[in-house]
Amino acid sequence: MGNGVKEGPVRLHEDAEAVLSSSVSSKRDHRQVLSSLLSGALAGALAKTAVAPLDRTKIIFQVSSKRFSAKEAFRVLYYTYLNEGFLSLWRGNSATMVRVVPYAAIQFSAHEEYKRILGSYYGFRGEALPPWPRLFAGALAGTTAASLTYPLDLVRARMAVTPKEMYSNIFHVFIRISREEGLKTLYHGFMPTVLGVIPYAGLSFFTYETLKSLHREYSGRRQPYPFERMIFGACAGLIGQSASYPLDVVRRRMQTAGVTGYPRASIARTLRTIVREEGAVRGLYKGLSMNWVKGPIAVGISFTTFDLMQILLRHLQS
């Protein structure tokens, strides 16, 4: 009986410790999610703003049958500057920010969560994931972010290829599309987007994480220097965008159909039209050379900013 009396307080003490431990763990998890969201949002905003003029020029070529060349691209940039002013090179960037900030925040925080879940499942808690789960985590993160923010991507594309008179601001785009074309138009081009995001996000995160893992193994340093992170991110962007680029062209055509003279069509029909009218390589890879300039810069800035912000926030929390 005496043992029962002793066991009661002991069990109560153990239960209290378990509840307290669970509460601390839950708060830590919430802080990690908020930290990832904030770091991802800043990373996306900085990266996209840095390459916004090149991004707008790329979209203009993607949605037209005009042949791409570096000379023509810089001519478009120059005439846009002359006719509409310097800040017009960032036209549509406000719509880009409205999309990119939540997109990047969701993508990076989802990637951290998927890494944790897959790492726990495969028994790699606290360590680098093996190759296939690493690729899978990136693909899942990109798909999650694209699914939740797609209408904002369509709005950004519309603003990039139309004159100011057609759409005055982001809300005007939403109102006109909803009224004149129907709400379902806001998800026109969604399937090629997801099909493109899977290899793009999967390969980007996979390449970046793999290069960081190899760096730790061969350099003996736990953390790369910022310029090394930029190089790893640039390589990740180059590989990811090259793999998914044809689907990027298809989604832009589908998103801007109705305002660029092209009829609305399915993925297969859009692909056939591009190949028939412009050729497989010229049509589906139009503007890729510009992406090889802007993509590595944007992805390098994005991954580096996210990592450095995570390190800073962890330091402040500790």
Swiss-Prot record:
Record-linked PROSITE patterns: SOLCAR
A Pfam family this chain is assigned to: Mito_carr
Gene3D superfamilies assigned: Mitochondrial carrier domain (1.50.40.10)
UniProt GO MF annotations: ADP phosphatase activity; ADP transmembrane transporter activity; AMP transmembrane transporter activity; ATP transmembrane transporter activity; coenzyme A transmembrane transporter activity
UniProt entry tagged with the keyword Glycoprotein: no
Predominant localisation class: mitochondrion
Highest taxon, organism lineage: Eukaryota
Keyword Transmembrane helix in annotation: yes
Solcar repeat placement: 31-117, 129-214, 224-312
Disease cited in the entry: Metabolic crises, recurrent, with variable encephalomyopathic features and neurologic regression: An autosomal recessive disease characterized by muscle weakness, developmental delay, lactic acidosis, and encephalopathy. The severity of the clinical manifestations is highly variable even within affected individuals of the same family, ranging from asymptomatic lactic acidosis to severe developmental regression, epilepsy, intellectual disability, metabolic crisis, and multiorgan involvement.
Summary of the function given for this chain in its UniProt record: Mitochondrial carrier mediating the transport of coenzyme A (CoA) in mitochondria in exchange for intramitochondrial (deoxy)adenine nucleotides and adenosine 3',5'-diphosphate.
Family affiliation: Belongs to the mitochondrial carrier (TC 2.A.29) family.
Descriptive protein name: Mitochondrial coenzyme A transporter SLC25A42
Organism: Homo sapiens (Human)
